[in-house]
């Protein structure tokens, strides 16, 4: 949340007596938080560059905007853990509570902390201390494997359409040395709405079509409101996290593995290509992974430069997420089809570098394209969070969202993606118009033309060197006329001046394609003492 969002929030508070009381409590607690040894001002500003750039007081930002958005005040305090341990309501600020009452009462700061009170001098282990514990954990799993026992792995999934490690899961499920399962976890960030249960059920239904019932571990909220410790209940050895963000209950976030016998691995959801990704790479959670798998030498070099561990826990295996694309040969059919893929960040993000979306600017044009180009088919595939965000009262609301969808689909050459894997749609499409982050590189795997939407040339500074190289192979659009020229000249007329250059460049980003998952599995297997060999057969 940036400074503008913070001011908007304060204005909304001022119009609501209850909100005004909450804002006053936040202002009152500012000094308490600012003086706390657990509030790390420099760390907070470094983790959230938009706050530093805005000049907003970091303690005030944490109280009014940061805590409601799930941000922590420092590397040694996890608000979600403290709130769960001590029964705090969602409205209570965890750090303010600890300094006003919890410290005196001996409240525990973390599940890692020994029972029996706060214990002055206790602190959260550093990433280096956490990494130093991995050899002992690895030795325990190696011993288990040497006895002929299967290595148990859990893949956390919050959205079936955002499951980058799925090819690695499938590779493990083909390998008799592993017992790999899925645990569908709640996304508690509130991006897609308040109640996580409907999204969990949709995710379960989608994955149940591809996996047997025993592959899906049961995850349900208890009558006390708590979520189960899936890793301990299953006896997991490995856990694959879907994100370096703390998107779910604390038992499903990377931090939960500290001090516990699990080996956490991570497969990137998006091919790292933006300035915002540097902020993610520098995060504490990335330093908690045993193995972080990267796509190519360029992204690994960025991680080594930015990460706390200077890349010591990372290696290049290729872009695991894109392996399945090779199973869908191009089959465009008799008519050319164009994908329309807008990003969700209509309100910005944790950093302005994530504010990629141009949808509100081009919504009318997108709705009219099927009528303007009847010789083309259009498939609308928005980011999964776009319409949940637009449904909020501050944007369109549900009725306007439904009306826009009906307007777009009123033409016979318009269709709406049902979500899930993008690979069949990528293979069956001839071009894309988009402003998404991950699709910038992923579409390159198809070799087909891309029209990338930018607000202005200053938007180019949101991209890291690799992202800028990708954009050089895209047809850039700064206005609606450029979008229509792309459809008319490149898609219909076939005058694609970037085709040869794009084909040569995409080979440099497609490392180990389509066997990146096999490379990741080989890395894990080697660390666990498995004999090297070819990928497991289906």
Predicted regions and their residues:
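Non-catalytic membrane-proximal stalk/linker segments that position and tether the catalytic domains
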Residues: 18-25, 110-152, 534-538
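Charge-rich, low-complexity intrinsically disordered regions
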Residues: 2-122
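A donor-sugar binding/catalytic signature common to diverse glycosyltransferases
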Residues: 418-462
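Nucleotide-activated donor-binding/catalytic signature segment of Leloir-type glycosyltransferases, i.e.
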Residues: 394-418
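A nucleotide-sugar donor-handling region in carbohydrate enzymes
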Residues: 121-139, 268, 281-355, 361, ...
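Conserved catalytic-core segment of nucleotide-activated headgroup transferases in glycan assembly
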Residues: 164, 168-179, 320-403, 477, ...
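C-terminal amphipathic helix plus adjacent low-complexity
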Residues: 121-129, 480-538
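Active-site and donor-binding regions of nucleotide-sugar-utilizing enzymes
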Residues: 154-324
């Amino acid at each position: 949340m940036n400074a503008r969002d913070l001011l908007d929030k304060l204005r909304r508070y001022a119009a609501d007596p209850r909100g005004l009381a909450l804002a006053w409590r936040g202002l009152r607690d500012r000094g308490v938080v600012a003086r706390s040894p657990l509030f790390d001002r420099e760390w907070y500003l470094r983790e959230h560059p938009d706050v530093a750039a805005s000049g907003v007081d970091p303690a005030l930002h944490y109280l009014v905007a940061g805590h409601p958005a799930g941000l922590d005040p420092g590397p040694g305090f996890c608000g979600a853990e403290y709130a769960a341990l001590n029964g705090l309501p969602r409205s209570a600020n965890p750090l303010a509570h600890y300094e006003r009452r919890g410290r005196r009462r001996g409240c525990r700061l973390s599940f890692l902390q020994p029972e029996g009170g706060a214990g002055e001098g206790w602190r959260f282990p550093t990433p280096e201390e956490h990494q130093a514990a991995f050899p002992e954990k690895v030795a325990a799993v190696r011993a288990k494997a040497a006895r002929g026992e299967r290595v148990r792995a859990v893949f956390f999934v919050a959205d079936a359409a955002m499951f980058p490690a799925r090819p690695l899961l499938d590779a493990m499920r083909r390998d008799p040395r592993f017992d790999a399962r899925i645990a569908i976890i709640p996304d508690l960030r509130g991006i897609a709405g308040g109640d996580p249960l409907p999204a969990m059920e949709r995710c379960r239904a989608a994955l149940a079509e591809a996996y047997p019932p025993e592959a899906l571990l049961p995850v349900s909220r208890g009558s006390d409101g708590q979520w189960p410790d899936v890793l301990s209940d299953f006896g997991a050895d490995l856990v694959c996290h879907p994100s370096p963000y703390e998107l779910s209950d604390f038992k499903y976030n990377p931090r939960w593995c500290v001090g516990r016998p699990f080996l956490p691995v991570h497969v990137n959801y998006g091919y790292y290509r933006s300035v915002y990704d540097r902020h993610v790479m520098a995060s504490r959670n990335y330093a908690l992974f045993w193995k972080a798998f990267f796509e190519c030498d360029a992204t690994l070099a960025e991680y080594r430069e930015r990460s706390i561990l200077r890349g010591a826990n990372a290696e290049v295996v290729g872009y695991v997420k894109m392996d399945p694309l090779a199973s869908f040969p191009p089959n465009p059919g008799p008519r050319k089809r164009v994908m329309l893929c807008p990003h969700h960040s209509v309100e910005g993000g944790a950093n302005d570098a994530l504010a990629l979306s141009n949808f509100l600017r081009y919504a009318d044009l997108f709705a009219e394209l099927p009528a303007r180009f009847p010789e083309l088919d259009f498939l609308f595939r928005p980011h999964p969070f776009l319409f949940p965000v637009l449904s909020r009262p501050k944007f369109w609301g549900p009725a306007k969202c439904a009306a826009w969808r009906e307007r777009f689909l009123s033409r016979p050459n318009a269709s709406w993606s049902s979500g899930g894997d993008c690979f069949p749609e990528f293979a069956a499409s001839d071009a894309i118009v988009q402003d998404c982050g991950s699709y910038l590189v992923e579409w390159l795997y198809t070799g087909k033309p891309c029209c990338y939407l930018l607000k202005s040339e200053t938007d180019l500074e949101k991209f890291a060197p690799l992202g800028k190289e990708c954009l050089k192979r895209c047809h850039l659009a700064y206005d609606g006329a450029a979008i229509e020229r792309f459809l008319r000249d490149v898609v219909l007329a076939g005058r694609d001046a970037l085709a040869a250059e794009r084909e040569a460049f995409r080979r440099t980003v497609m490392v180990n394609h389509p066997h990146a998952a096999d490379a990741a599995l080989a890395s894990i297997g080697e660390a666990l003492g498995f004999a090297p060999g070819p990928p497991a057969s289906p």
